[in-house]
């Protein structure tokens, strides 16, 4: 057999072996062909392990909704960050009850808000991307703001919201058109407001925010999910700047730079209390 023939046969054999590899072994950085899905573990392929809901981060995912890519690790409690404590460990039933227990029996939120609904709404990155102290501070900040906004989870809707402003931003109405007869005043734990926030929250968590804004006040799971959406979209990324930055992200136009200091200080006092409950220092830059 000639050397040329041998080389040709070896090349053919190599190509044959490579071609027989499953498609899932290629493109670990997800440079997949258009017809292949990229799994959460960074492999290309087809079928439920690659394209299924919860398994797919890009490509023709089933349901059309890619998930956030994950890295294979030793299984841990969901929501556990670098410090080893999960959100559910930190937000115990006793902690939650300690907040809502301060609300009067006549408060509408008393029989609406639940710890279970909060936990079901928790984003995987919430209280889960920093040190143990960082994670506890974020959770303390979240509950400080919802305690302020709802007066210890007493209120579901903005007081007198149904007779007040419609919160329809006309500058954004072309993109987020306000529905006839609907008002986009504060609802839920973070008092979600304005037509554009309702629209975007609805798109993110799956409800008609413009046509049915009332759902944030009637369905507790939607209520907490809308609050978590707002937090992760607008607040989560500034936690490393201190609590003051979170106030600025939520209501900076009215409570920063010396404005409405009683309101801003109320948030700070809640934050300090919850940090103390979690055994963590509140850190610097508490004001905005």
UniProtKB/Swiss-Prot annotation:
Q: List the CDD domains hit by this protein, alphabetically.
A: chitinase_GH19, ChtBD1
Q: Please cite one Gene Ontology biological process associated with this protein.
A: polysaccharide catabolic process
Cellular localisation: Secreted, Extracellular space
In this chain the sequence repeats are located at 67-69, 70-72, 73-75, 76-78
Signal peptide: which range, if any? Answer: 1-27
**PTM 4-hydroxyproline: at which residues?**
66, 69, 72, 75
- Sorted UniProt keywords: Carbohydrate metabolism, Chitin degradation, Chitin-binding, Disulfide bond, Glycoprotein, Glycosidase, Hydrolase, Hydroxylation, Plant defense, Polysaccharide degradation, Pyrrolidone carboxylic acid, Repeat, Secreted, Signal
Q: What is its main location?
A: secreted
Post-translational changes noted in the entry: O-glycosylated on hydroxyprolines; contains xylose.
Describe its function: Defense against chitin-containing fungal pathogens.
Listed name of the protein? Acidic endochitinase SP2
Organism this protein belongs to: Beta vulgaris (Sugar beet)
Record lineage:
Eukaryota, Viridiplantae, Streptophyta, Embryophyta, Tracheophyta
Q: Which gene encodes it?
A: SP2
